[in-house]
Amino acid sequence: MASSGSGDPLDSKRGEAPFAQRIDPTREKLTPEQLHFMRQAQLAQWQKVLPRRRTRNIVTGLGIGALVLAIHGYTFYSISQERFLDELEDEAKAARARALARASGS
């Protein structure tokens, strides 16, 4: 395999581009310049991804908020329907009582 500084952007045998190796800064001795470069690269990557992440977080928050409002709205609607059904049930009891009174009175 070609060394990292050979100038060949593709590995000619496999046709793949080389990529950065993952290193552990606590185990390997790195110079202050290398550590500074790593921090700069991490910051640049974070700033590049931040707007997309922020947009996704906003969309997720709005979706959850809409779901909460829908649940509350449905709850209020079903409670108002429940009262309506109670009134119908009372009317049905009264109608049954009248029918029973007519049947026993005749």
From Swiss-Prot:
Keywords: Acetylation, Coiled coil, Membrane, Mitochondrion, Mitochondrion inner membrane, Transmembrane, Transmembrane helix. Residues 1-28 are annotated as: Disordered. Residues 78-104 form a coiled coil. It is found in: Mitochondrion inner membrane. The modification N-acetylalanine is found at residue 2. The chain crosses the membrane at residues 58-80. InterPro entries: Coa3, Coa3_cc. Residues 81-106 are mitochondrial intermembrane. Residues 2-57 are mitochondrial matrix. Core component of the MITRAC (mitochondrial translation regulation assembly intermediate of cytochrome c oxidase complex) complex, that regulates cytochrome c oxidase assembly. MITRAC complexes regulate both translation of mitochondrial encoded components and assembly of nuclear-encoded components imported in mitochondrion. Required for efficient translation of MT-CO1 and mitochondrial respiratory chain complex IV assembly. Belongs to the COA3 family. This is Cytochrome c oxidase assembly factor 3 homolog, mitochondrial. The lineage of its organism: Eukaryota, Metazoa, Chordata, Craniata, Vertebrata.
